[in-house]
Amino acid sequence: MSNLNVERVLSVHHWNDTLFSFKTTRNPSLRFENGQFVMIGLEVDGRPLMRAYSIASPNYEEHLEFFSIKVQNGPLTSRLQHLKEGDELMVSRKPTGTLVTSDLLPGKHLYMLSTGTGLAPFMSLIQDPEVYERFEKVVLIHGVRQVNELAYQQFITEHLPQSEYFGEAVKEKLIYYPTVTRESFHNQGRLTDLMRSGKLFEDIGLPPINPQDDRAMICGSPSMLDESCEVLDGFGLKISPRMGEPGDYLIERAFVEK
């Protein structure tokens, strides 16, 4: 257990019946890059039951934040969803992950493609001033089935632009594009279809993705990752083959290989 820190739950927010987020204390020894994940868990039958979770908070915050689905029969999530303020949670001491901007080649525009709780690592990254220094536009696309699954929408549209540190950069550079597949909404459709048809680019006022200018990061379900990779490959982008070797786009490999 020496590779784990015990943290305390500071707050829990239930977005709807299937999604929740929670904040915990952060051991000062934990250092991570925005976009990385840690293993978190609870003690079950005397042993730690751990799962990989992206850190949704930026690395300069004193707390940690996580974003999760509720799975009624999931070994860990069935328990995590009942967390309350003051409860203890185990967090691994070794963050890792492939969604780090240092593994992207230089470019003008950064596309963050997410579905569901795949938004989590990008919540960390859109609060990173360095991301805005590196790119002229940062496009955050969040695909969900129902409107009430658009977690953090108000935070992204109202709170972030008011940041005293990088609010001006957010106003100038961040394009937030939520899209819904099973209800009426001002943006509708799967993000891969919106990219293929060109509607996404018309809506945001940028040219279609090309390998000279555009970089991307993807986090979502295995099928969404496969399809998004196919679309980006079709635009001529090349994936980063492994950690430490830059490419035009990145996927979170850990969640794929499970």
From Swiss-Prot:
EC annotation from Swiss-Prot or TrEMBL: 1.18.1.2
Pfam families per the UniProt record, alphabetical: FAD_binding_6, NAD_binding_1
Top-rank taxon, per record: Bacteria
GO BP annotation list: cellular response to oxidative stress; heme catabolic process
Molecular functions (GO terms): ferredoxin-NADP+ reductase activity; nucleotide binding
Residues binding FAD, per UniProt: 51-54, 67-69, 74-77, 117, 254-258
Keywords per UniProt: FAD, Flavoprotein, NADP, Nucleotide-binding, Oxidoreductase
Presence of keyword Hydrolase: no
Functional note: Transports electrons between ferredoxin and NADPH.
Protein name stated in the entry: Ferredoxin--NADP reductase
Encoding gene, per UniProt annotation: fpr
